[in-house]
Every structure is written in C-alpha cells, then in structure tokens.
C-alpha cells in the first residue's frame, strides 16, 4: 500500500496501553467503547495529516480486525458529524466485534469471555461511571475484580499465554450475572454494538469459517442487518481461517473489492 501512494496509519486508542497507576489503568479505557474508539480512529487520520512528509489527504479507507473492526464501523457511522472533512472511500472489517451482546453471550463460560471481559468491563465502568449500577462490583466476582488490573496491563496479542494463565481459574467464576440480561450492562453492550445507522461508504466484511471467537453466524447476522438498512456490503468467508488469521488471509479479497489499487 505504501508503494501505491497510501499513507498507512495505526490507531492508538485512548487509554489503552497506558501504564498502570497503583494497580489501576491510568486514563479512560476505550476497549469496545464505540464512540471513543471511533474518534480515536478518525483522530489518527487527522494526526497523520499534520505530518508534512506523510502527504496524507482526505480520502480514507478504514480497515481493521476484531475490536478494531468495531472501531472502524463506528468511525464510519460517526465520520460525517465528527470529521466531516474526511471522505470515507470504503470500510473493511475482518471478524468485527459488531454485536457485543452476541459476543459476550457466546463466551460467558470460557476463557475468551474472561479475556475480553477483563478489558471491556473496566473500560465501561470508567467511561460510564455516571450510569447507576455500573460499578464493577455489580457484574464481576471479587476474584475477577482482583485479577482484571493485572490482565489489563498485558497485550492481547503478545501476552495471550500469560493472559490465559491468569484468567483460566476465573472461568465459571468471572461474572456475578449474565451481562447480556441485567442492567445497565445489557444496554451498554447494545449501545456499543454497531449498526445503529447506515453509512454511505461500501463495506467489505471478511469472516473465517474456523473462527471460534467472533462466530460466523453472528457475522452473517450483522451483514444481513447492514444490508437491510441500506449499506452496500460485500462479505466473504475464508474457509479454514481462524480469528487470528482472517485479517491476513482476507487480503487478496480485500485488494479486489476495496479501492486500494486506485480502482473504484
């Protein structure tokens, strides 16, 4: 993409990766918080435009995976109001965390749910601190509350083994209640799920058939919803691709259907 004249920008999400202070993450979290993540994505483009050598223009292709997929979908929804100077040419998401209710509901009693929850619940509790009943003690067990700061300090990609070692004893003892069924968590999960409003840019969605985190059926339901509200969607399923490999294995299809070759 660099050879084709594109400026490539990776988003530094608000609050994520910040050193902990007294065992607690400094700053507001943004993990799976749709509006915050969307603004981080759009602000990253604006930041690149401030670098003269980058020669970054206003035409933007948004492309991310998993949590990042949710972020670019929200960015596409919010771009016209938050960053109207940017022209979103296309949106692409691989195995996006599009429906948080389904994502959390599918993994309440496994290590994936513990891992995702260790990032998401503390982030929600900080961002929505003024919402009645949003304290971590309303949804997480004391054992989970004790371990989440340690898990928060680790990177999901580079420290997955360590994360799972910490989280495995919490499987079955992580939440006090089903967060998809009790308030205010059910509403927060719904509000941070994508698809509340359409956007004009074409959408490319890639899903791995062997993905055990973002389930193929959930992505198919998301695609159907986007189509029903008027979004131009091209969806592909890559046979045998897992959650960890789909972003790479979908690149050939991405190049065909997203304007990164100077095409339309």
Predicted regions and their residues:
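C-terminal catalytic histidine-bearing segment of alpha/beta-hydrolase fold enzymes
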Residues: 186-187, 213-216, 220-264
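Primarily recognizes the serine-hydrolase "nucleophile elbow" in alpha/beta-hydrolase
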Residues: 46-114
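Short amphipathic alpha-helix adjacent to the substrate-entry channel of hydrolases
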Residues: 1-8
């Amino acid at each position: 993409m660099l050879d084709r004249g594109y400026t490539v920008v990776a988003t530094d999400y608000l609050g994520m990766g910040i050193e902990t202070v007294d065992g607690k993450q400094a700053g507001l979290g943004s993990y799976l918080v749709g509006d915050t993540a969307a603004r981080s994505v759009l602000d990253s483009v604006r930041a690149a435009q401030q670098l003269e050598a980058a020669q970054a223009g206003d035409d933007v292709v948004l492309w991310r995976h998993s949590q990042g997929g949710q972020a670019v979908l929200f960015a596409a929804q919010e771009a016209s109001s938050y960053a109207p100077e940017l022209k979103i040419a296309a949106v692409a998401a691989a195995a996006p965390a599009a429906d948080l209710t389904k994502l959390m509901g599918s993994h309440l009693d496994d290590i994936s749910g513990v891992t995702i929850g260790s990032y998401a619940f503390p982030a929600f509790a900080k961002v929505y601190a003024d919402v009645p009943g949003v304290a971590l003690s309303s949804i997480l067990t004391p054992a989970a509350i004790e371990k989440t700061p340690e898990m928060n300090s680790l990177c999901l990609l580079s420290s997955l083994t360590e994360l799972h070692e910490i989280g495995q004893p919490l499987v079955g003892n992580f939440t006090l209640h089903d967060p998809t069924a009790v308030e205010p968590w059910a509403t927060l999960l719904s509000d941070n799920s994508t698809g509340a409003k359409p956007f004009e840019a074409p959408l490319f969605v890639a899903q791995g058939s062997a993905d055990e985190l973002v389930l193929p059926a959930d992505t198919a339901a998301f695609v159907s919803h986007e189509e029903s509200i008027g979004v131009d969607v091209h969806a592909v399923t890559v046979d045998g691709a897992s959650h960890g490999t789909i972003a790479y294995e979908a690149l050939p299809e991405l190049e065909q259907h997203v304007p990164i070759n100077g095409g339309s």
